[in-house]
Amino acid sequence: MAGSLLASHLAMAHPHGWIDMSVRVITDDNGVATGLHQTWRMDPFYSLVVFEELQQVPGGSMEEGLDQLGGEIRDNLAAQHYFTEVRIGSEKQSFGDVTEYTALERGGRLTFMFILPLASPQPLSGQVLEYQVFDPTYYIEMVHEEEGDEPSPQALILNGEPECALSVLPADPDPELVMQAALLDTDEEGEPGLGRHFAETGRVDCR
């Protein structure tokens, strides 16, 4: 039941919930990027709804329900490229299958953690890696973890060798798109790709 709720939550349009996220770019000892470790914290209201549904499953524990939910989230996201786009230089990167993931309760929030592997590991030396994580329909707003009004130092981390400049760039959507999104009801879908215009950009500059 919680899985179907999540599927519908992910399939609709414009910002009626949000996810606080943090990203760790994984590199090997040679400074080659191998993937992105992402942590998503669902908003408190949605988390409460999911936890209440899991508690109502007869004969099941919360831990078992979360294990099943993690697999359902992974499967739903796989069909949508995990809401993630990555570029290194001018080249858009493809992804491998997500096999490492978990769903858990942390501080009252439903938290989903997973490693998104690059299909082909890429050296970062002399390169700029940029990523965006967004719901294409903008039903869910994806934002990096914040401290005050600024991205948290833990919102983007580089794990591994190269010394690179890390930054999270804010979205700068056209005012007409902001109005378009605000006028959508919960049962209406936005234009395909609407969420891209509201996406923050994580940048790892190793030049």
Outline where the language-model segments fall.
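Sec-dependent signal peptide recognition
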Residues: 1-4
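Early extracytoplasmic/domain-onset interaction patches
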Residues: 15-48
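Structured domain cores in non-transmembrane regions
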Residues: 45-124
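Residues that act as N-cap/strand-start positions at coil-to-secondary-structure junctions
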Residues: 17-19, 80, 125, 198
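Sequence-level motif detector for i,i+2 pairs with an aromatic at +2
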Residues: 33, 81, 199-201
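Mature, soluble, non-transmembrane domains
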Residues: 89-207
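N-terminal signal peptide c-region/cleavage motif recognized by signal peptidases
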Residues: 8-10
